[in-house]
Amino acid sequence: MLSQVYRYGFQPFNQHLLPWVQCTTISRSHCIQPSVIRHVRSWSNIPFITVPLSRTHGKSFAHRSELKHAKRIVVKLGSAVVTRGDECGLALGRLASIVEQVSVLQNQGREMMLVTSGAVAFGKQRLRHEILLSQSVRQALHSGQNQLKEMAIPVLEARACAAAGQSGLMALYEAMFTQYSICAAQILVTNLDFHDEQKRRNLNGTLHELLRMNIVPIVNTNDAVVPPAEPNSDLQGVNVISVKDNDSLAARLAVEMKTDLLIVLSDVEGLFDSPPGSDDAKLIDIFYPGDQQSVTFGTKSRVGMGGMEAKVKAALWALQGGTSVVIANGTHPKVSGHVITDIVEGKKVGTFFSEVKPAGPTVEQQGEMARSGGRMLATLEPEQRAEIIHHLADLLTDQRDEILLANKKDLEEAEGRLAPPLLKRLSLSTSKLNSLAIGLRQIAASSQDSVGRVLRRTRIAKNLELEQVTVPIGVLLVIFESRPDCLPQVAALAIASGNGLLLKGGKEAAHSNRILHLLTQEALSIHGVKEAVQLVNTREEVEDLCRLDKMIDLIIPRGSSQLVRDIQKAAKGIPVMGHSEGICHMYVDSEASVDKVTRLVRDSKCEYPAACNALETLLIHRDLLRTPLFDQIIDMLRVEQVKIHAGPKFASYLTFSPSEVKSLRTEYGDLELCIEVVDNVQDAIDHIHKYGSSHTDVIVTENENTAEFFLQHVDSACVFWNASTRFSDGYRFGLGAEVGISTSRIHARGPVGLEGLLTTKWLLRGKDHVVSDFSEHGSLKYLHENLPIPQRNTN
């Protein structure tokens, strides 16, 4: 039915559209809904939420994060957004998605208005169809329906196309909005309607009444009779913007209606510092009016009237009038596919116009500084990088009181908001700082032979030698939750490996992170590489950071399994090092020592239950049930107040069992433990492979053959024999500290220290060598001789 409305416009409304509207309003089951709308509603995943809404009353929002509070919103749809690529007809799928997003926001209690193009394109299609119908049969057969574009069609006057297309365009909008129980109303205006005071009052009153009745006004310039543009002033000489196109119309409408937000959708990502498509063009995230001189404009779009310069002029005028503005791409949304709702949710989409000059560098600028700073860091001598890390270790102990005071502020603000395990992670202490300093000095000692180490030397041919050497990965983004002690650890590893570093901590640790970052930069300053480590503003969304694929080479999440999964999902194009879960197992064999078991279980589960290497599932050999050893384990867990969850097999052995576990694949992160029964070591291995996360798994036994079988067959990053799961840690492994624990199977696995932050490059030194010299009749032959690797002096 939409295709009929789209084809014939408003005239055949009674014949084609009315029966469908009637059947949808009374919900007759035998009526078929339009395929376009049915498809849109089936894939829709826009969250229907209610947020606190407030009018800005003439003052624009200062930050993107505030846009979610916008109540009155104007969405301007450019010609390139609503029309097809052939400039003849509308992009129905794109338009349906836009209507859906506007409807969702309207149903949240917002007041939505549309300024739309498309009447000319709609009318052009209808008039071309009329020309085809006016042909003779012979002409029609000769040209063919699919060759309509190649016909000798006279140039169609834009005003005539607009007149022919307005009714059909509005009928299409009505049909789409009806699916969301929303009414739409059309308003056609010209520049004179804004210059005549009486007409302005009438327009203003009409729009307010429509909004009051929960109707979406659809506004367009009356292109059928549009007069030439007026000067940019009203009758009293006050500076206004003349309605020359829909960009200026949207800005004028937004200011007249005291709108909170104006969204201008075009066919480009936003405002660039140079014409899009040029090699050095960079998208401007936040545009401050004072930066206008730094922008170079290109040509306008294929079908638009104004181009980017007109959009920026209109946006700045609206901003001056108290309306926040975002210019974004409405043709190929880059985030979730829902550009309008993404903008309202405060996501980094397009260019946000703000009267508040950004405080400090943008995250893109921080990425560039980390890149250049990291390259400078990599060129330092190993002794200089070690000196920086030693100085940072000294600062952690010398500035202990200031660090603990900042951490106390974080703890006070987090009290009652964070769960006890997270509060424990957030807390710093003198002993933690001392351990940090010791770990940093270990990193400094190991950094002497890291960057530039020769791994392989090969003589390819005479006077042609190849070397493989270690080099930094580039720029690392480390995202961590509630762990301020993670900051100096990761910073030291990045310094030792010559990597640039972006740090994104949780807002719950803002005070602690700030002082620790200042101390890190103070240490870096002794060799002039202060910018190598950057602390990203807490306003930056993690999802936005994960899209900076041109600035970030590796993402390392440190936090909950949900955080890791979210980052792995969002980071398209950037490798992620980490583990999504830490489901660690301990298998107690039938030949386990009674004296060892309780010590190992207590340490693995109770020493630090919030850690990712804490024990989560205890596997017991069935022969140990109802034995003193089993009773001893249970008694110890009761004393430690550990809540026990029974696995299915374990529950079947008990008359009165603890609560049966909901899932055998659970990371508790607290004093909770799953106990399950297995038949033998192979059964334990099968259980671990089915329900584990390939993190850390342990066997407790006195049988060496059984232990070796377990060690060789369990496919996890860390596999231990008669040792606590808590040893799975970079510091305890002698790595100095760890940047994280990886369960992936490439590059790095297990606790990742300094070595995991390095990659390699190949250096080939020759003397006028060319490949043709090695052909069948060439003068040279390949030798491929392995050469000794020189030992570096690390004293």
Swiss-Prot record:
Pfam families: AA_kinase (PF00696), Aldedh (PF00171). Residues 1-361 are annotated as: Glutamate 5-kinase. Its main location: mitochondrion. It comes from the Eukaryota. ATP binds at residues 266-267, 305-311. Residues 362-795 are annotated as: Gamma-glutamyl phosphate reductase. One of its GO terms (cellular component) is mitochondrial matrix. Can form homodimers/multimers. This is Delta-1-pyrroline-5-carboxylate synthase. It comes from Pongo abelii. The gene is ALDH18A1.
